Amino acid sequence: MGVLQEIFSKIKNFYTEFSTEYCKILLNVVEYFHILCFPHTLCGKIPRKIPFAIKMPSRTADWRYIMKISMAYEARISEILAEMTLEEKIAQMQQVSPESFRPEVFERFRKLGGGSFLHVLGKDADAVRADAENTRMKIPPIFGIDAIHGHSLLNGAVIYPSQLAMACSWNPSLIKKMGKATAEEVNADGLDWVFSPVLCIGRDTRWGRVDETFGEDPYLIGTLAAAITEGYEEDGLVAACLKHYIGYGEATGARDAYDTEISMRKIREVFLPPFRRAVEAGASTVMTAYGSISGVPMTAHRQLLREVLKDELGFDGFVVTDWYNVGSLRTKQKAVESFADGVRVTVESGNDMSMNSYQFYEHAIRLVNEGKLSMELIDEAVRRILRVKFSLGLFDENKKRMPKECIGSKEHIEINHALTRESLVLLENNGVLPLKETPKKIAVVGPNADDIRAQYGDWTFFSHPNRAPEDTMPKGDYYTVLRGIKTVFADSEVAYAKGCDVMGYSADTMMNEAISLAQSADVVIAVIGAILAQNGEGKDRAVLELSGRQGELIRKLKATGKPVITVLVNGKPLCLGDVIENSDALIETFNGGDLGGLCAAEMIAGKFNPSGKLPISFPRASGQVPCYYNQYAGWHATKYMDVDEGSLYDFGYGLSLTNYEYKNLTISADTAKAGDVLTVSVDITNTGDMDGAEIVEMYYNDLYSSVLTPTRQLCGFKKVFVGAGETVHVELPLAVNDLSLVNANCETVLDPGDFEIMVGGSLATLQTVALKITE
């Protein structure tokens, strides 16, 4: 047997090094041979452990994806399914968490061999895993965690910028590194599954969860989603979970989990493409949304789950409901007559695992026994769950676990530092940045200057449902803006006054103290925005203007005559009229994570040149939303009678401490057809005296289309370094199929005709070349 194992291992190594068709066929043959030689690895009443690890390659390439679900691999799952009882199968379809189940019920599922556990960390996960070893089938559980911007529910793990903040980097390769680093920390903590990335479209900024999105553009979201998914999945450390499928962020009135009134054509045009990209990148799981699509609950939407996601997109992983979605079909949405009906509809519609609907287990068993729920559907769901568990190596007794020391490691902090720097966006600069001389005295003012909870945003250990009593402050290194300023400007006197609270009416004494401090300083750094209570699930806002007395604070600081540098710490875009008028410089950090304050201070000092650009539009007034850039043209443009036309800050906007000049825009061919890939080229010159990185944005406009299309749609981008005084030649690939539209019959087609291809550093500075698409 040892000889056979050695042969198999060598062939696998050969396959990894030489990924040819020959090797693929050979490995399939050898896998069948392995089954014949070692049938005990498939089934039987002995422990179901694989004698040596069969490390399946990443799904980042098509052939690897195919191998991961090879017939031999599926044969193992079939044998396990054949031996499982109904009760054991349904247990695999149940996810439980300690905060939502009574202790005795939670313990019961531990002993039953529950399929998944949520919000169980470290040693607690090890204990649950040990319980699974004592069950008859010994099927390992999969542990899920909300790792939205790092393994952030664990105090001591690296907390990265929020998804919206990191999207400002427009840097897929860096975001992929962040995903891999997060996977390592989650894996080291004994967990296997991250509920990330969020692929909702953040177009209505009243919605409370905009901070969790990659912004408003499907192309950018899809690109970044694919990158972070590859980072999570490529080493088999954790499974990614794409959420929330689908249209969740577009609910009526931006109220969380309400109905979303969008057509199937709009779903295919705007909301489905990011999921398609992430599925192609190898995502193992998908989570359904709370809400409904035109009155049909997503949990019960058979067309979108079975026909579109599983059949059309070829998604082979498993679908998990969101929190208590099965029960909510009855209690909130009134879409079923009973909880049992909810269970039946959920499974029939294509959900494979129920999250925290505690009655799912008993009802599902009874429904199958009564012939009201097909065993075939149960087997399909469990197969998908087992498939993911096999792909993660959970059945392997030598499952790869990263060392605990990687949690909060220096390497991960360095990734965070780089990503946070690239996530900051310079919105305004009247020549004050970078500070030319070290100030003698700096006044740091504002309610968010020293509030790490506000800086972190949602989904950190502060909001963990089972937070340890001692977790009142971060264990790792963190920098609020105040601490960052004190660190970077160590030779300056730095004094702080809060000035006001973010919400509610603040006493005049607070305001007066801040103004007095500002009058005595050489420069004022004001840190304002929003706090955790104003962002997150169920925290939707009707008013996006600054809350409390923050606007008044900025006006009074400006009246002192001192330079005012305003730093925004906020989850999502706000209306900033007074702030812009009364600031000499304006920096957007969104929720900057551990190092948001440090990087803001470094930018102010000129230690790096900001390169971030907005992935989302800023409204001028609350009544203007949604104001995303790629809307259809209307009869009367986008103007209101009482608000200036257009957004306050456009999608793709962001300043630098240098200037870039675009010249010589060309396209490799002025006619093309479906399937062609063209090259769009431009020369970029850094005309300033500071090195920098520029995000080159490419858009298209279909000049005549069979349905309405936006006048500008993102179809490519590239981040390039340009030294001071240097000129860089930039080439952008343009896949002609990316210019397709979804017609009135919900078909994706490429309309022949005339197109404009536009390239520039922002929507306001685009240059154009012509392209004709032929039949």
Residue ranges of predicted features:
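Ala/Thr-enriched low-complexity intrinsically disordered regions
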Residues: 16, 20, 41, 53, ...
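Intrinsic disorder/low-complexity segments
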Residues: 22, 29-30
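Glycoside hydrolase catalytic-domain context in secreted enzymes
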Residues: 62-743, 747-765, 769-775
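Short, Lys/Arg-enriched N-terminal segments with co-localized hydrophobic residues
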Residues: 48-66
